[in-house]
UniProtKB/Swiss-Prot annotation:
Component of the large ribosomal subunit. The ribosome is a large ribonucleoprotein complex responsible for the synthesis of proteins in the cell. GO terms for cellular component: cytoplasm; cytosol; cytosolic large ribosomal subunit; glutamatergic synapse; nucleus; postsynapse; presynapse; ribonucleoprotein complex. This is Large ribosomal subunit protein eL22. One of its GO terms (biological process) is translation at postsynapse. Belongs to the eukaryotic ribosomal protein eL22 family. InterPro entries: Ribosomal_eL22 (IPR002671), Ribosomal_eL22_sf (IPR038526). It is found in: Cytoplasm. Coiled coil: none annotated. The modification Phosphothreonine is found at T62.
Length: 128
């Protein structure tokens, strides 16, 4: 008996998955310890697409800034964790890592917050 060929319906092309991540730098920018434009430039130079930094894959990854929020949009697989890694690298480079931390405040956004050190020190002083 001859093998039976199954008819498989071929699906159309998958629509491009657009990933959109936001970095909220409102607090440090308002306090004047960080420059959002400088951070945006850092991301443009450092984000790697296909193993190459600097060119953003010819428009595959775009970075936009509105006041103190930076939005990274990607049409290729892009990790949110990679964005956190680059943000921490920027903070370390500018000696801000001791005061700021990167916190996920939603599924597709990060926020830069201050460490809550002052409250702990005040509580310790009250106990003495």
């Amino acid at each position: 008996m001859a093998p039976v060929k199954k008819l498989v319906a071929k699906g159309g092309k998958k629509k491009k998955q657009v990933l959109k991540f936001t970095l909220d730098c409102t607090h440090p920018v308002e306090d004047g310890i960080m420059d959002a434009a400088n951070f945006e430039q850092f991301l443009q130079e450092r984000i790697k697409v296909n193993g190459k930094a600097g060119n953003l894959g010819g428009g595959v990854v775009t970075i936009e800034r509105s006041k103190s929020k930076i939005t990274v949009t990607s049409e290729v697989p892009f990790s949110k964790r990679y964005l956190k890694y680059l943000t921490k690298k920027y903070l370390k480079k500018n000696n801000l890592r001791d005061w700021l931390r990167v916190v996920a405040n939603s599924k597709e956004s990060y926020e830069l917050r201050y460490f809550q050190i002052n409250q702990d020190e005040e509580e310790e002083e009250d106990e003495d």
